[in-house]
Amino acid sequence: MRFARLLKRPLPILIVIYLTYSLILAFFSHRGFPQAMSVDSIMPYLADKPVGEDAFYILTVAWNLADKYTISYNYDQLTTGIQPLVTFIYAIFAWVVQLLGGDKWIFIRIVIIYNVFILLTLAHVLGSIAKKLIPNDENEKYQVYFLTFIITIFNFGLFSLVTYGLETGTYLLFIATSCWYTLRFTNNRKLALREAIVFGTLTGLTGLLRIDFGIILLGFLICLTLHQRVTVRIRWSLLVGFTAFFIVIPWFIWVYYVTGQVMPSSGLAEARLIDLADLSGRFRVVLIEIISLLTLNLIIAERLRILVAFAFFLIIFIFFFRKNHYFRSLLILDSRKKQYIFYWVLALVPLIFIYPVFFQSTWFYKRYFSPLLIVYLPILAIALHRLLQNKPRRFRVASLLIFIMCFFIGAILSFHSGRITHTQAVAAGFAKENFPPCFKIGALQTGILGFFNNNVINLDGKMNYDIHKLEINKESLTTYLDRENIDVIIDWEIFIWWEFLYPEDKKARFLANWKGYPHKIPDGMTVCFVRRQTHNCQNFPRYH
């Protein structure tokens, strides 16, 4: 009887399936480094995935923060190229690991587990948002909660974004919690002082996860203020803004102390105003990533996304517009709460245009646009509920199994195919084997490389503000290598060529002091150069 009752409400079973897979991924992924870009193993390497290259920058700073109590990268270099709140959360994990004598591999496993539970909590909050949008009917509230929960935790694209290890999961959770909290405002005709302080604190902490959340908050407060009783809401919105600003201002003080500017070094490295040459490329990526998010990443092959998405939206159009009772399903939402959701939509949509105009890092666009899921997933779940509620039970079960099946197909193809994603996972092992700590290694991509090798210094400016000073002082990167006594350069061949080997006069000057390292890095993309006369480790035999 209990089992039959459990099957009627299968959410606990599905949570167990999700957690079982996620914990297997965290505990049984391999330590060490792959020796090639394809390996004979169904489990990934911790140095490669699910935690990714860019997350290892934050993990390095978090590890150093726990060890040395300072926000620094390798060589005790003060840095601003992080998202502060998630770094401090990770630093707590790192401190516990160090206290108990653990190593960096254990630290990575804990970060994965943390983000697995963050996604689970996010699913609960999004489900709670969906419940609040449904008036009165408790059974219907549970159904939309259940659907929202399932399409959140079994969304492989979202799972991979969250377990990548950056601030994304925690950031989405805080935005969702902020959105959920505002739905409580509909119960009060007058917004109270206490609500302003709580909401301001919540949004201030969200700002410490991504500073550009300020754009979203500003958009929401403008919509709220212009709605009605403008004078009262202006005072309330100003109190929210001041509370949030009070929370984030210490971070800006730190950034200014380290760099003399208010923009973190990672922002300077990624920012570049769009021009005509970039226009089509950037907005093509925008289109692909928005489609990917809206189709819940069910389609992995990039070239098929636009075609499949067109078919997907055509089906939606037919169901919701030709069959009016499906379209009207969205009209039954609680009117006042729907109004607040609409404010969030208006606040989030500008992200689609702001990021491609001001930021060149197109590989981050999916992460930048992911806050759209906060309002999209609950609304989609409500629409799916209306679509499926009168269908046979087998049809409803089969529809849910599609999401679960696509999740595990994505997981198998991405994590368990034996394919290495990040060349730096191979390069990190190569550096550790070939260059002891007395060598100082420079690289533009130092996420994985710098986390596992403390003798690596960042050369692209994400973590190292000195690189941005070179442009201000009109100095070359080669000058910086000399000044910092860097003996080894490891990076993709195209980056080395662009920075040091083009044009010919620059190549001649560089090769006068540097030579190719005789041992090849087995990833097929990364090359290594060493000084002809090293500043350090002069007696190391493999160097000569």
Which residues make up each language-model segment?
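Membrane-proximal envelope and lipid/glycan-remodeling enzymes
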Residues: 1-544
